[in-house]
């Protein structure tokens, strides 16, 4: 039995450089120190990784740059998983259907150069903690305020545009730019979809909140999106540029899943899965730092990892021809 113990650094670097296999067995096969896959699995189940582990890396960048908070969730697909902790049936905006998976709410900092930095996350597990997605959203807002974050705006889709959320953001002294459902009541029992909204936006009274500005945007697929904001005297171009930043969190989620093994934890325990999720984000942060410091594209970074192994294999096979 191996007496060595896995570490956060080793696990994160493994997730960063591997591209196909993310299991404890795979790590044990390539680890520079002797580790059995059982010892790695036990370590993953017993260690305690928390989202605050990556706030220490994010804090300097968030506090020194101007930017916005982007909030959105992603579903870790577990359609073939049964009797595994954290997995539940829930609605997926990507699939537009109910799917089995793990719900993950992320807060992301996007600065003026559109460089992104993970700030915090929560796992949606209502049977364990009794919290809704909006409860988690407000909790993350309070934590961000305690950490002295000062965003230009908080940006999210219509799922998080409840009155309680909007009022909290306002009370924290921040602006918000949120999607609004087409049947949202404004003015005297009018629906957004029934209003004539000019390109420069329309000032309306949001029931239970107060006066806001609303903009109407047509998506390429023909869908009409309504965006509300408490920004004073907003222009269409300004709101459009802020909403466009929401795309960065979609890129972040895709990279997490495709390159950091976010969905590939094989453990059945909730603690191990939580640890794996946090460590996946930490590995993404390490990868992003390398790209930024060395001026590498995402694809250059991937190629740098595998090209040495390919070169060695070429030498080996040519030698035996």
Language model features by range: what are they?
Residues 31, 44, 73-75, 158-160, ...:
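Short, flexible loop/turn elements at secondary-structure junctions
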